[in-house]
Amino acid sequence: MTKILCGSIAAIALLASSAAFAQVKMKADITGAQEVPPTTTQGKGSADVSFDPATKKLSWTINYSGLSGPATAAHFHGPAEAGKNAGVAVPIPNQASSPVKGEATLNDNQAADLQAGRYYINIHTAANPGGEIRGQVTK
C-alpha cells in the first residue's frame, strides 16, 4: 500500500510540475485603433505567440496586411497596459513581409511582464513611424 501511495504521489508531482512549465499560448489582434493615439489605417494583423516558462523562450508568428506602406520596424513593447505606451522590449526582425516568424529568450522581468499581459506588438511604417498597428498580447 505504501509503495502504491508513494508512486501515486510521485506521478501527481510529476504531472503538476510539467503542467506548471507547459507552453503558454497567447495572441494579439493588431489594429490601428489600438495605437496610442489611434491611427486611421486599413492595416490589420494577428499574432500567435507562445512562451515556454522553463526556457523563457518566446516564439511568434505575425500576419498583417493593408498597411500604408512597407513595415519599417516591428517590436514587442512593454511593460504597458492597453492604452499606454512603453519602450521596445524585444525587436522583431525580418518584419518587411508577412508572415513574420521569430523567437527570443526573455529575462525574468520580461517573462513576468509578458505573462501579466503588459506586452504589445507594434508594427511601424514610414507614414506612421510611431506605429501604424498595435495589439496587446493576451492569453
Q: Where are the model-predicted features located?
A:
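Metal-centered catalytic cores of metalloenzymes
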Residues: 2-8, 12, 17-74, 78-139
